[in-house]
Amino acid sequence: MQKKLDESNRPRFHFTPEKNWMNDPNGLVFHKGEYHLFYQHNPLGNKWGHMSWGHAVSTDLLNWEHLDVAITEGADGAIFSGSAVSNGDEITAIYTRHTEANQSQCIATSKDNGRTFTKYEGNPVLDLAMADFRDPKVFRYADYWIMAVVKPHQHVCSFYRSTDLIKWEFLSEFGPTAAVGGVWECPDLFPLSYKGEEFWVLLISINPGAINNGTGTQYFIGDFDGVSFTPKYSTTDPRWLDFGRDNYAGVTFNNEPNGRRIFIGWMSNWQGAVLHPETSWTNAMTIPRILGLTKMGDEIVITQQPICEPTYEIVIDATKKHPSGLTGFVELGYNPVSKKIFINDYETDVEPINQQVHLKVIIDRTSVELYTDDGTRWITMAVFSEPKVTRELTNFG
């Protein structure tokens, strides 16, 4: 008799696979009226393996329709992370083909809005004969395509260009710099504006070696001229997209119709994903976040605002002598001594405004996302406990 698995921990409005294992978001693209979310997926079980691309679509980024596996592992190798572009009437996926000895970049094309894909017969389209060379992010720039792809152990992001997605010309490299305590993965490069001035943002995920001693995503603000990325500020100290432990491998949507830069991350980490409770599904994505820029002191920094309303809004008196916030199945709030916001043991600096700290919280059964009102500080944490434990929080302090 098949064991019935408890579904009470499944998030209500964060994306989860219909069943089996999921990790990195892949191929985020808007095409013909639908947001496409592809993702690293094991169609055969709840643990990592048999990597293929799962697939779901949405019109609002909150309600998702599960579709069949888009690109499956084959005799020639597993289907690792990558991206997708809207290319006329077609969707072209650009992904890493993985074998024990080699990682190379390949493409597959869909003529039916992502429902089926055909692998290019001439694959791979980019092969350096390296064991670790992966995670291509491709986007349109001027009249050609740009690819950002990493050499993980060298802590280098390489840039290539192409006019047809098949023949690729090497342009430049960025790195090593900033956080290099683990492998570099899942790059993304995109423009954002602040008060009419355009900047370019480069995202690099790292595992391990992030601020929380696990996985995380660092970002760089700078300029991209179609050939090379030049950081605007010193890269000695890394800048972190999230100060929690559970936001990794995040990338943004190509071809977003409203001009927004929308980010989704894997709401887990490689240290804790194996501890996921026994359910029919494994792992979730962060809430989609709209990225922007603001100025803190003399520097431009990233802001993130969720596409949904928060569960809680908290205004904390920063003049109190003791920490205050919300407590229950987790404890979160603000510590006036250290001037940090926190979820359990994860924290980050926050400067009060008019002696107040404005916090917002998104709770969805097994996850907590805490962020400042201006969106400059986020802490994301997956939390698993007994299903009957309340998800309510009460004030303390």
Explain the meaning of each model-derived region.
Residues 42-46, 98-101, 152-155, 207-210, ...:
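Short glycine/acidic-enriched loop and turn motifs that connect beta-strands
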Residues 52-60, 105-113, 159-165, 215-227, ...:
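Beta-propeller blade signature
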Residues 1, 195, 221-397:
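Beta-rich accessory regions
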Residues 31, 87, 139-141, 190-192, ...:
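Structural WD40 beta-propeller signal
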Residues 34-37, 89-94, 144-147, 196-202, ...:
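Entry beta-strands of beta-propeller and related beta-repeat scaffolds
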Residues 1-26, 45-48, 62-86, 114-140, ...:
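Surface loop/turn signatures of beta-propeller and other carbohydrate-active proteins
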Residues 81, 90-124:
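Carboxylate/His-rich catalytic cores and anion/metal-binding grooves
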Residues 73-77, 100, 116, 146, ...:
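Accessory beta-strand-rich segments of carbohydrate-active enzymes
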